[in-house]
Amino acid sequence: MKLILTHEVSGLGTPGDVVEVKDGYGRNFLLPRNLATPWTKGGEKQVETISKARKARAIASLDEAKAVKQSLEARTVAFAARAGRGGRLFGAVTPADVALAVSAAGGPTVDKRKVEILQPIKTTGTHKALVRLHPDVSATVTIDVVEATA
């Protein structure tokens, strides 16, 4: 099945890519979640539109991505969450929470889909998260999770 990706799918491609996948994967996973659209003759225009939008949103140059990386790695992001005894959180810190905390701390706006938490953050303390800024540049963000005061 030939599809046009509308969102980034790890291991498959980025928005605007034309991919060939098995029918079941396309019908049961990609299409229902609006991660892709079927390839049509009018798909050429859609690919161009998606790639233009992606370029407008993406960090344009490698130099700019490196500058943002230095900015992110230089700061520690504080995040307050409700916790029980022993510093165990009620829930977990999600990539969306990390993206919001980075923006609130005065950092650049980060897309939650670009934040990768390698180990679930379920306790207070210092943790690390990876932010993919550019295909060649990733920044490691230090997150300091503290107990929220009521």
UniProtKB/Swiss-Prot annotation:
Which Gene Ontology BP annotations are present?
A: translation
* Keyword tags: Ribonucleoprotein, Ribosomal protein, RNA-binding, rRNA-binding
Name the protein family: Belongs to the bacterial ribosomal protein bL9 family.
Which species expresses this protein natively?
A: Kineococcus radiotolerans (strain ATCC BAA-149 / DSM 14245 / SRS30216)
- Give the domain of life: Bacteria
Write one Gene Ontology MF term.
rRNA binding
Name assigned to this protein: Large ribosomal subunit protein bL9
Query: Which residue spans adopt a coiled-coil conformation according to this UniProt entry?
Result: none
Q: Name one GO cellular component term.
A: ribosome
Matching PANTHER family, A to Z? 50S RIBOSOMAL PROTEIN L9
Query: What biological function has been recorded for the protein in this entry?
Result: Binds to the 23S rRNA.
